[in-house]
Swiss-Prot record:
Keyword Isomerase: no
Lineage of the species this protein comes from: Eukaryota, Viridiplantae, Streptophyta, Embryophyta, Tracheophyta
Gene giving rise to this polypeptide: TPS6
Species this protein is from: Vitex agnus-castus (Chaste tree)
Pfam families named among the record's database cross-references: Terpene_synth, Terpene_synth_C
Pathway note: Secondary metabolite biosynthesis; terpenoid biosynthesis
Name under which the protein is recorded: Class I diterpene synthase TPS6, chloroplastic
Cofactor requirement: Mg(2+)
Domain comment (free text): The Asp-Asp-Xaa-Xaa-Asp/Glu (DDXXD/E) motif is important for the catalytic activity, presumably through binding to Mg(2+).
Length: 594
């Protein structure tokens, strides 16, 4: 059974638009990992227009008699940018990436020419700046200088939706010395907080969206945000639309059927992968360990939140399994194992050979090593197909580096060795395991990665900045617990380092660490956004998404150890079906009356 969507022809740009008809399966869940079955096809031969592509995606044609004449219109950048923002927030931008790239290239040319359609409207200017900077175009924040101080801002533009766009623009600050974005962020965040506190945002959906942005902007997980956007979606909050009819294409019941089917497809895949993770966990006998954390559900959620495309199943499973293994072994080093047993695991990984049962020394060591050994070997086999070369030496090396950092930390706190913050971070950035999790998952993105790329200084710097962010965020939230456990932590190291100088308070130490987090986050963003790179942008994006994961996990607690918000988000992302949108509901009611 299939659905056919018929949409009106809507003028949008100067590109060719042709009407087509396309069919989509109706079934709620499609349990498959086949790329050809999962990926919704998007081949165009006649049109490169953004809305034309959306129309062809949803409405396609089955015979030439339905073809409509070519229509040419002037480019409308404000509407195009709103369209892109909607597609990204609704999680379907991946189907229109070439069209989005074309729109942003045109936007950049007009930005350089200071086109009035962009610069005359504050919201459009802020949105264009954000999109262009994220895409890697050289755009200066000087163009936002007129809005850097609230006292100089015309009260007429200080409506909530405009300030939200200025706030989002301020979040792409990549230089420490950028005082314009710093000031912009200061007043827009204050303004929006005041609006929430005074309850002056009458639109409930907009109120919730502002609340969501302010809560933890850099910890927003893409797929969680998609689910929220689908629940809250309302085109009415865009103030710069010149022709409302142009948005009928993304605000009608047919489009929401498409969105819901796309989300349900992804959700079904996540459910299947959770079952696979649970079977793997039991097959590896990790469920028999009577210590530490079982993070199967947590890891499944984090993988789903970071790698949203249905076809990236191998990347999600590799990422999730690596998180589980890291957590189990980390807990063994910290809590359950003796120093000798911990050393034994490192020796076994260096040797990388299976042993007779009696040679492992303990049941726990045997289970942990064999689980790691079998899983990494499986990764290597799958990656060989995708990469066209053996990556097992790389994967083993990553684990040796990680376990060596575990050993250094173990030696430091058991020997009560005094460290400076720099000495601590020299190994602690490795022990947060971002490097092994990220580089393992990168093997399964469908991008060929050479040894030179993975051993480059750029790769090392990406890993280091990412790891500094997540390591220090973790340390701030786990400081009290780890102090009681007598384990090493950046906060305790900083406090101890000033013991013989001017003593600093815990608040001052935490503030200093948060400054380091921000510095490394901006450096990471700059590396991800830059155009010149040995890594494709698809790979660099993963580093940024994993840093957002750190902000998500350690915003106000330790969601990895005691997941609360995470479990709520997992329900909506993995388990709860997407409800009918009011537009669809109205259509169903109307159909029932006929």
């Amino acid at each position: 059974m299939s659905l056919r969507f018929n949409l009106i022809v809507t003028p949008f740009s100067n590109y060719e638009i042709r009407n087509r008809r396309e069919t989509f399966p109706v079934q709620k869940f499609l349990m498959t990992t086949s790329k050809s079955a999962i990926k919704v096809k998007c081949s165009l031969k006649t049109s490169i227009d953004l809305v034309g592509k959306i129309r062809e995606k949803i409405n396609g044609k089955v015979d030439n008699s339905l073809e409509v004449p070519t229509i040419n219109y002037l480019v409308d950048i404000p509407s195009n940018l709103c369209m892109i923002d909607s597609l990204e927030r609704l999680g379907v931008a991946r189907y229109f990436q070439s069209e989005i790239d074309g729109v942003l290239e045109k936007t950049y040319r007009l930005w350089q020419q200071r086109e009035k359609d962009i610069f005359a409207d504050v919201t459009c200017r802020a949105m264009a700046f954000r999109f262009l900077r994220v895409k890697g175009y050289e755009v200066s924040s000087d163009e936002l200088a007129p809005y850097a101080d609230q006292v100089h801002v015309n009260p007429q533009i200080s409506d909530v939706t405009t300030v939200v766009e200025l706030y989002r623009a301020s979040q792409v600050r990549i230089y420490e010395e950028d005082s314009i974005l710093e000031k912009l962020h200061a007043w827009t965040s204050t303004f929006l907080k005041q609006q929430l506190q005074s309850k002056t945002i009458s639109d409930k959906k907009l109120h919730e969206q502002v609340e969501y942005y302010l809560k933890n902007y850099h910890g927003i997980q893409n797929q969680v945000a998609v689910r929220r956007s689908l629940d809250l979606y309302d085109i009415d909050h865009y103030p710069i639309l010149k022709v409302a009819d142009r948005f009928r294409i993304i605000y009608n019941e047919d489009f929401f059927v498409f969105l819901r089917q796309d989300f349900n497809l992804c959700q079904a895949q996540h459910q299947k992968e959770l079952q696979q993770l649970q079977r793997w966990y039991e097959d590896c006998r990790l469920d028999t360990l009577n210590y530490g954390r079982n993070v199967v559900h947590v890891s499944c959620f984090l993988a789903a939140a970071n790698f949203g495309d249905p076809e990236l199943s191998n990347a999600r499973l590799a990422f999730a399994k690596t998180i589980v293994l890291v957590t189990r072994i980390d807990d063994f080093f910290d809590l359950a194992g003796s120093r000798e047993e911990s050393y034994k695991i490192l020796e076994l990984v260096k040797e990388w050979k299976e042993k007779p049962t009696e040679d492992y020394g303990s049941k726990e060591v045997e289970i942990l090593f064999t689980a790691l050994y079998d899983t990494v070997n499986e990764f290597a086999e799958i990656a060989y197909i995708e990469q066209g070369r053996c990556v097992k030496p790389l994967l083993i090396k990553l684990w040796v580096e990680l376990l060596t950092s575990f050993k250094k930390e173990l030696d430091s706190w058991t020997d009560d060795t005094a460290l400076t913050l720099d000495e601590y971070l020299s190994s602690a950035w490795m022990s947060i395991a971002c490097r092994v999790c990220t580089l393992t998952a990168l093997q399964f993105l469908g991008v060929k990665l050479s040894e030179e790329m993975l051993s480059s200084q750029e790769c090392t710097d990406l890993c280091r900045h990412l790891s500094f962010v997540n390591r220090l965020l973790n340390d701030v939230q786990t400081f009290e617990r780890e102090r009681k456990e007598n384990t090493i932590n950046a906060v305790s190291v900083l406090l101890a380092a000033h013991r013989h100088e001017r003593a600093i308070t815990e608040e001052e130490a935490i503030s200093k660490i948060q400054e380091i987090v921000e510095q490394n986050r901006r450096k990471l963003m700059r590396m991800v956004y830059q155009r010149e790179s040995v890594f494709p942008r698809k790979c660099r994006n993963v580093f940024l998404e994993v840093s957002k994961m750190g902000h998500y996990l350690y915003a106000s607690g330790d969601e990895l150890t005691t997941p609360q918000q995470l479990m709520e988000d997992m329900k909506s992302l993995v388990f709860e079906p997407l409800a009918l949108h009011p537009l669809e509901t109205n259509n169903v009611i109307a159909s029932g009356k006929n």
